[in-house]
Structures are given as structure tokens and as C-alpha cells.
Amino acid sequence: MVTKPTTPKPPPALGIPDSAYTVDVRVIDTGTLLHLNPSLFWQPPIDGFTGLHAPIYCFLVSHGSQHVIFDLGVRTDWENYAPKIVSIIKATTTVTPGSDVPSMLDEDTSGLGIRSADIGAVIWSHNHFDHVGDVSRFPLTTDLIVGPGVRGVSWPGWPSNPDGIVLDSDVEGRVVREVSFEAGLKIGHFDAMDFFGDGSFYLLDAPGHAVGHLCALARTTANEPTFVFMGADACHHPGLLRPSNYLPLPSASTLAGVLTGPPQCPGELLQQLTLPDEPFFTVAPRMFPDHDAATDTVRKIQELDASDNCLVLIAHDLSLRDKIPLFPKTINGWKESQVKTETRWLFCNDFMPALHHLDNKQGIEEELGKQSSLKCS
């Protein structure tokens, strides 16, 4: 069956105040990979899609001489996390270690010259192990910024608290600031905080996955405003964002040009996995305890994702790994270089094992149908 493309619904206005100020954004991929088990993060299951080994994107945000890091990824010696977290890691995932953010800053030979000692603040999107890194690697002049309620559920950490999920060393001697969204600022439908006070960088309240979960929005150009949205773990796969009624699934022939694999008519096979204007997945309750809030957060991101002027980067998007400029390069020129349009549907290649499975299944069913017809004749 060939599905006709759906007419897209016009996306809503971004609702972002004008500003002449921008920040430089550098995406940091430390090389660490984390296995994502689909049943933990998204639903429904797709036969043949058993998960993936995904990166963890962190971000260096520079506002003139001021530098902050949004998320730190996994520490290289993850066995030195709190014992409770080490047990969870061993039971639920596989970590393929790479480097870490402070090492990449301090060992960079590009001439950029931004070192760990220059970082004014580390921002945790939330307090899960694959985002908190090792804050103690930064000097005590580096503040730690967390979302609402995170201090209360995080500290005392281990070893003061035997059941701690973060470490005491993350905050010993360090200023910890908890973000407030009580000022009433809105970016799109998100409650927001203007981090530098000039409209260049916002922290956004994005609940659902964890207490105090934050996303961020950076203004990357001003004359024609463009933005990078840092989605953290608001969702764990682009298939929760797309297709949407703003970005419907393209034609089978267009998809065939995106997909890399041998099944005949892969675009038509892919169209059987979802409706043309509904995402492949929704968030799974197990890792999104506030399921209603998480679903609403994804809906808000879909509105930004539909804008030609906003590039959405979620933390674990494997499809972008070798397609976007990485540290020490900036990603500010993403629109001019057509990063968004050229990568929008690349994540569908994650489903190639599922398409093989579906192709084989339909081939078997077709053959059984032929045999049944022969017996009846």
C-alpha cells in the first residue's frame, strides 16, 4: 500500500522575543556510547528494532568570554558513580567509554583556548548518570546549575547517603544554583529563564523524565534569527518527534533516497510503521514517571522542531553523529549549511533491521498464501 503524503499543518509562531545577542554553540561528542533499550524509553515496540548504541551530546555555550557547559555526559570511570547507580547501569545498559568534557577542553589543540578552568557554570539537564559527568573535574569557581527540586532529591549524595544517586563530591565547596521559572517568561509554550539576561540563551522547564528536567535554547544568529534547541532527555529518539502534523512522513520515493539498505521499496515498508502525521513512538512510562507531563513536553518540542529556524538536538540522536559539526567547531551556521533539511529523516535508518524483518515476514506470508491457493485449486 502506497501512502499519500499528508498536507502539513503550518507550525505555530516560535514566540521568542527579539534580540540582537547570540551565543556560540559547540556540540561535544565525547565518543561515549550508551545502549538504549526501547522498552525503557519509547513505545510501541517495533519488531526487529532492538535498540541502539547512542551518543550523548553535551554543549559548550559561549557568550563572549563567558562559557557554560550544558550536560557532561558519562564520566570515564563510571564504576566510581554512587554504588546504587553502578548497579542500575550494570542491570539496564552497556556503556562504551570514550573521553570526557573536561579532557576534551583541556587537550584541544585547535587554538580555541577554552579550558575547563574557563567554565563559569555547568548546567545539568537532570541528575541521571549519563548527563552529570564528574563535576569535581572543574575548579570550585565553576557553579553547578540544576532545575527546580533537584537539590532536594540529589543531596546528601553518596557516601553520606548510602542510597545516594549522585556524589557528595559534585557539590563540595561549590556554589549550586537552582533555576526558578517564577518570573513568567515563556518561550513557545515552555516556561523559561533568560540565562544571560539578553535573549541569547534560555533554560526551559521540560518536565516528565526526571525531577527538574531542563532543556535549553540558544540564539545562533540574530539578523535572521536561528536557534539550537538542546533537548537533553525530553525524549530519547527522533521517532518520538517525527512524523507530526507539522512534519508528515514524506513520500515513499523521498524516503527511499534517505534509507540505506537492500529491501525493495524501503520507503513503502517504512510507511507501514506509523500513520503519516503521527510519530513512530510515544514516551514509555518506565523512564517517564510523569507521563502526562512528558507527553506535553514532547508536543511543545514538536512545535519548535517544525520551524525552519530551529534545529532540535536531543542528547541521544545517533543519526546526527557524523552529520553535524562537532567541537571545536560551532554549529551556528547550521541553517546556511542545510543541516536540518538534510538530516531530518536520517533517523529512519535506525529502523533498517525492522524493515528487513517486515520484508521477510511479508515475503513468507505471500509465499504461504500462494501455497494455500495451490492446495485449494
From Swiss-Prot:
SMART domains: Lactamase_B (SM00849). The keyword Metal-binding applies. Zn(2+) 2 binds at D130, H131, D233. Its EC number is 3.1.1.-. InterPro entries: MBL_superfamily_lactonases, Metallo-B-lactamas, RibonucZ/Hydroxyglut_hydro. It holds the Pfam family Lactamase_B. Metallo-hydrolase; part of the gene cluster that mediates the biosynthesis of the phthalide-terpenoid hybrid 11'-O-desmethylfendlerol. Within the pathway, mfma and mfmC act together to convert 3,5-dimethylorsellinic acid (DMOA) into the phthalide 5,7-dihydroxy-4-(hydroxymethyl)-6-methylphthalide. The biosynthesis of 11'-O-desmethylfendlerol begins with the NR-PKS mfmB that forms 3,5-dimethylorsellinic acid (DMOA), which is then transformed into the phthalide 5,7-dihydroxy-4-(hydroxymethyl)-6-methylphthalide by the cytochrome P450 monooxygenase mfmA and the hydrolase mfmC. Belongs to the metallo-beta-lactamase superfamily. It comes from the Eukaryota. The gene is mfmC. This is Metallo-hydrolase mfmC. Pathway: Secondary metabolite biosynthesis; terpenoid biosynthesis. Zn(2+) 1 binds at H126, H128, H209, D233. PANTHER family: METALLO-BETA-LACTAMASE DOMAIN-CONTAINING PROTEIN, QUORUM-QUENCHING LACTONASE YTNP-RELATED-RELATED. Keywords: Hydrolase, Metal-binding, Zinc.
